[in-house]
Swiss-Prot record:
Belongs to the MecA family. PANTHER family: ADAPTER PROTEIN MECA, ADAPTER PROTEIN MECA 1. InterPro entries: MecA_C_sf (IPR038471), Neg-reg_MecA (IPR008681). Enables the recognition and targeting of unfolded and aggregated proteins to the ClpC protease or to other proteins involved in proteolysis. GO terms for molecular function: protein-macromolecule adaptor activity. This is Adapter protein MecA. Residues 118-128 have a biased composition (Basic and acidic residues). The N-terminal domain probably binds unfolded/aggregated proteins; the C-terminal domain interacts with ClpC. It comes from the Bacteria. Residues 118-137 are annotated as: Disordered. Homodimer.
Length: 239
């Protein structure tokens, strides 16, 4: 486990899933077993206190990002004077509630994704072949954008007008954000690529995320004519 002291009131840590298992917890424990999840977070707090003298005083605010290889957790002490005057028992109860809420939200999000994509996600095939595909795309040109939510993805799928069909595409997701990568054949004119990118930006946003980052940390949830798949499985949204 790697611990970073951000300032007097905030610490950040990253722990791999193998390290989690070495501590007697499983990856599933974190997101499907609330009691075990709480035990894990409290054990981390004890270790942080020992290494960084980060004593639990008053309520804590926690933020968790789950990656393919591990979990990043940011923990901050409240600077609110009223909340700092809470008793230790009240602070502990509030921290437990925050952990429970966090685990519930994470579990709910994962359940929804499973329901939405379990019929179409061939994770074994996609994860096993994505690096091979990346190597095969050396002669292609790539654009990557991000969608803030699934509704934006659906809107793009129904309202876009592709200028060319000479491309491959992948839809990734990480930290609740959707990333859409388009790989154009090498002989496609740059003007066509520019026009396609402009059309994408009517529904999505630029991003500095790279293909390497997405392959390492994101999950492929759709591939091969993403827009057609979205239209097949999701109705058009109405304002």
């Amino acid at each position: 486990m790697r611990i970073e002291r951000v300032d007097d009131t905030t610490v950040k840590l990253f722990i791999t899933y193998s390290d989690i298992e070495a501590r007697g917890f499983s990856r599933e424990d974190l997101w499907t077993n609330r009691k075990r999840g709480e035990e894990f977070f409290w054990s981390m707090m004890d270790e942080i206190n020992e290494e960084e003298d980060f004593v639990v005083e008053g309520p804590l605010w926690i933020q968790v990002h789950a990656f393919e290889k591990g979990v990043e957790v940011t923990i901050s002490k409240s600077k609110n004077e009223d909340m700092m005057n809470m008793s230790d028992d009240d602070a502990t109860d509030q921290f437990d509630e925050q952990v429970q809420e966090l685990l519930a939200q994470t579990l709910e999000g994962e359940d929804q994704l499973e329901e939405l994509f379990e019929q179409r996600t061939k994770e074994k095939e996609a994860q096993g072949s994505k690096r091979q595909k990346s190597s095969a795309r050396k002669n292609t040109r790539t654009i990557i954008v991000k969608f803030n939510d699934l509704e934006d993805v659906i809107n793009y799928a129904y309202h876009s007008n592709p200028i060319t069909t000479e491309f491959e595409d992948l839809l990734y997701m990480v930290d609740g954000t959707y990333y859409y990568a388009v790989y154009f054949d090498s002989h496609v004119d740059q003007e066509v690529i520019n026009d396609s990118y402009s059309q994408l930006l009517e529904f999505a946003y630029p991003t500095d995320r790279t293909e390497v980052y997405l392959n390492d940390y994101a999950k492929i949830i759709m591939s091969h004519n993403v827009t057609a798949q979205v239209r097949r499985y999701f109705p058009e949204t109405t304002e």
